[in-house]
């Protein structure tokens, strides 16, 4: 009985394909030519590889419908984006399908890329592999003073890490500056300005690794969004409200030693690696834009409306140095007809999962909450890439009864390539739109009924005149603070006009700036004088402090105008440059002292 079983087993093993046969293995492929470009000019590492992939055949007649892409073990954990395209074709809808896979006994991450057309033996295809890595440029030294420049270290691979052999390869490294402390010398690389060229390297075996290291100056903004919550609230009454809560951190070299605001404002190269401001691109239809932090509205931001977008310059209250953090909120409204589509009771919301915050952005952790109208059902989400979903929540706001459904999604390690649309499908019964108007009618009915009863009752209310007086004084003081800050801003703007005049020597620019300063300064000073009179009427002792501040401001204005006169004399050749610089230094010191006194008075107010 056992003999026939043994014979059948031996026959099955003889007929089964061996592990090395063509039926059990994918066709062998070869990287005929690889051109790598490693862009290290920002705080991201962008690696682009142009690969000529060949199917040499080698006795195999099988067609290759896909190939395997590998990432180095040292960089795999910091991968933010991976895209593969066929070279020479339009970018739209040209991304090849990529799925992560595993290779037994090999380290690193591996992906299977599906080819648009299967490769026959002897044929080739040119592809472009784009990868973006975050937090792989490490500051060295890790701490610098305000006046020092920032240097970083990057470690990678000289070779194109691949499961296939490579016949020839070159690598070009683009740095942020020409100031290079050191770099590896494999193959005697050439250097031109901020470019390092390695190779060509010949006949590179599969899975080859050789450490590439470069230590160079990089003062680009190392700005990272450590946490961001994006809330999208949809209303069927024509509006979509968007609000973004952003936690920012400068992840470059940590500031060592004291910080001098005077040097920071006076010297352009002071804190060269710090972040003074950045630009956020909002949708073209954005309206009612606001920007605030824990203190309140930040008035130093600027909004520029363009044809295809709204550009917002965000300037934090203080410059960001290495290790420093800040938090702010940006919100705006959008018309729903541009993003919300419907067919009967079927609705589709198409919006960006994450939008532009700043150039070369890095988001460590993103939470997106999409608040749908009350009564939305059968919710489905189509995302352009993998996202993590949390259980749906309920959100209650005005006139809600059983709550609005909230979609909660998460993703980590995002870059600009993740700025893509997400589509949310749901059903909504339009009859439910009558719910809120009926609730409003009922609320007004109850209100009027309550008022009718209230006016027929007699209540005696005792007022507190002292409390009302304090509230009036506080309101007037707040207006004075706003106007004083506005007046100081006029001086800063005029300083910029004087600097432009010294460069262009256009006297009309200076005269126009003087006229604008006089007009606006007179208007603001008059408003402060009116508020000072109101404080005096209220019997507040703050009136004297405002009067003192007015006197100090007159001295500041005198110094500002004197500085403009000195600039005219300098441009006209009536004043030597050394004398001008010395006078300007003395004037700046006096002016800074006066501004400090004004700040102390403002703090007292």
From Swiss-Prot:
What does UniProt note about where in the body, tissue by tissue, this protein is expressed? Expressed in all tissues tested.
Compartments in which it is found: Endoplasmic reticulum membrane
Q: Which residues lie on this side of the membrane: Lumenal?
A: 23-437
Query: Pathway, per UniProt?
Result: Protein modification; protein glycosylation
- Disulphide bonds annotated for this chain are none
The record lists the membrane-crossing segments as: 438-455
Q: Which GO terms describe its cellular component?
A: endoplasmic reticulum membrane; oligosaccharyltransferase complex; oligosaccharyltransferase complex A; oligosaccharyltransferase complex B; rough endoplasmic reticulum
Database matches in InterPro entries: Ribophorin_I
Q: In the record, which residues are listed under signal peptide?
A: 1-22
Q: Which UniProt keywords apply?
A: Acetylation, Endoplasmic reticulum, Glycoprotein, Isopeptide bond, Membrane, Signal, Transmembrane, Transmembrane helix, Ubl conjugation
Modification after translation is described as:
Ubiquitinated by the ECS(ASB11) complex.
Which location does the Swiss-Prot or TrEMBL entry give for the cross-link Glycyl lysine isopeptide (Lys-Gly) (interchain with G-Cter in SUMO2)?
Answer: 536
Cytoplasmic side stretches: 456-605
Q: Which PANTHER family match?
A: DOLICHYL-DIPHOSPHOOLIGOSACCHARIDE--PROTEIN GLYCOSYLTRANSFERASE SUBUNIT 1, RIBOPHORIN I
Q: What does this protein do?
A: Subunit of the oligosaccharyl transferase (OST) complex that catalyzes the initial transfer of a defined glycan (Glc(3)Man(9)GlcNAc(2) in eukaryotes) from the lipid carrier dolichol-pyrophosphate to an asparagine residue within an Asn-X-Ser/Thr consensus motif in nascent polypeptide chains, the first step in protein N-glycosylation. N-glycosylation occurs cotranslationally and the complex associates with the Sec61 complex at the channel-forming translocon complex that mediates protein translocation across the endoplasmic reticulum (ER). All subunits are required for a maximal enzyme activity.
Summarize the subunit comment: Component of the oligosaccharyltransferase (OST) complex. OST exists in two different complex forms which contain common core subunits RPN1, RPN2, OST48, OST4, DAD1 and TMEM258, either STT3A or STT3B as catalytic subunits, and form-specific accessory subunits. STT3A complex assembly occurs through the formation of 3 subcomplexes. Subcomplex 1 contains RPN1 and TMEM258, subcomplex 2 contains the STT3A-specific subunits STT3A, DC2/OSTC, and KCP2 as well as the core subunit OST4, and subcomplex 3 contains RPN2, DAD1, and OST48.
Protein's name according to its UniProt entry? Dolichyl-diphosphooligosaccharide--protein glycosyltransferase subunit 1
Which gene specifies this protein's sequence?
Rpn1
């Amino acid at each position: 009985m056992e003999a026939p079983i043994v014979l059948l087993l031996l026959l099955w093993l003889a007929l089964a394909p061996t592990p090395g046969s063509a039926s059990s293995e994918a066709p062998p492929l070869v990287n005929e030519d690889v051109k790598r470009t490693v862009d290290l000019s920002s705080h991201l590492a962008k690696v682009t590889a142009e690969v000529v992939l060949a199917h040499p055949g080698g006795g195999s007649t099988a067609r290759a419908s896909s190939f395997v892409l590998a990432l180095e073990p040292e960089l795999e954990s910091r991968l933010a984006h991976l895209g593969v395209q066929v070279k020479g074709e339009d970018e739209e809808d040209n991304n090849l399908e990529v799925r992560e896979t595993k290779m037994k006994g090999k380290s690193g991450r591996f992906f299977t890329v599906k080819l648009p057309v299967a490769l026959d033996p002897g044929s080739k295809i040119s592809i472009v592999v784009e990868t973006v890595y975050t937090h792989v440029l490490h500051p060295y030294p890790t701490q610098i003073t305000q006046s020092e420049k920032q240097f970083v270290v990057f470690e990678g691979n000289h070779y194109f890490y691949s499961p296939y052999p490579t016949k020839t390869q070159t690598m070009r490294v683009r740095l942020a500056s020409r100031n290079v402390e050191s770099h590896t010398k494999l193959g005697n690389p050439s250097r031109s300005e901020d470019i390092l060229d390695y190779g060509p390297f010949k006949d590179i075996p599969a899975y080859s690794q050789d450490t590439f290291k470069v230590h160079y100056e990089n003062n680009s903004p190392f700005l990272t969004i450590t946490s961001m919550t994006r809330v999208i609230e949809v209303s069927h009454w024509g509006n979509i409200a968007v609000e973004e809560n952003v936690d920012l951190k400068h992840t470059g070299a940590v500031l060592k030693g004291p910080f001098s605001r005077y040097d920071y404002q006076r010297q352009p190269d002071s804190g060269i690696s710090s972040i003074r401001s950045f630009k956020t691109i909002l949708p073209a239809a954005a309206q009612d834009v606001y920007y605030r932090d824990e203190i309140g509205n930040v008035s130093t931001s600027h909004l520029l409306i363009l044809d295809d977008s709204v550009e917002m310059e965000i300037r934090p209250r203080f410059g960001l140095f290495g290790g420093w953090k800040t938090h702010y909120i940006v919100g705006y409204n959008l018309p729903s007809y541009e993003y919300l589509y419907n067919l009967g009771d079927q609705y589709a919301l198409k919006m960006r999962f994450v939008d532009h915050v700043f150039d070369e952005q890095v988001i460590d952790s993103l939470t997106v909450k999409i608040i749908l109208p009350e009564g939305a059902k059968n919710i489905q989400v189509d995302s352009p890439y993998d996202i993590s979903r949390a259980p749906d929540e309920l959100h209650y706001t005005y006139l809600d009864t059983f709550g609005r459904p909230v979609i909660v999604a998460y993703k980590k390690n995002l870059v600009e390539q993740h700025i893509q649309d997400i589509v949310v499908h749901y059903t909504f019964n339009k009859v439910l739109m009558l719910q809120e108007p009926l609730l409003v009618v009922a609320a007004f009915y109850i209100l009027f009924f309550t008022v009718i009863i209230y006016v027929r009752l007699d209540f005696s209310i005792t007022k507190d005149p002292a409390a009302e007086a304090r509230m009036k004084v506080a309101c007037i003081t707040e207006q004075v603070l706003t106007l004083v800050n506005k007046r100081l801003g006029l001086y800063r703007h005029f300083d910029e006009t004087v600097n432009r005049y010294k460069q262009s020597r256009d006297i009309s620019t200076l005269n126009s700036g003087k006229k604008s300063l006089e007009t606006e300064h007179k208007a603001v000073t008059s408003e402060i004088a009116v508020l000072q009179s109101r404080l005096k009427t209220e019997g507040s002792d703050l009136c004297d402090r405002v009067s003192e501040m007015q006197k100090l401001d007159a001295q500041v204005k005198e110094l500002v105008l004197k500085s403009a006169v000195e600039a005219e004399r300098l441009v006209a050749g009536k004043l030597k440059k050394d004398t001008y610089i010395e006078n300007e230094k003395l004037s700046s010191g006096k002016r800074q002292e006066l501004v400090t006194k004004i700040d102390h008075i403002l703090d007292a107010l």
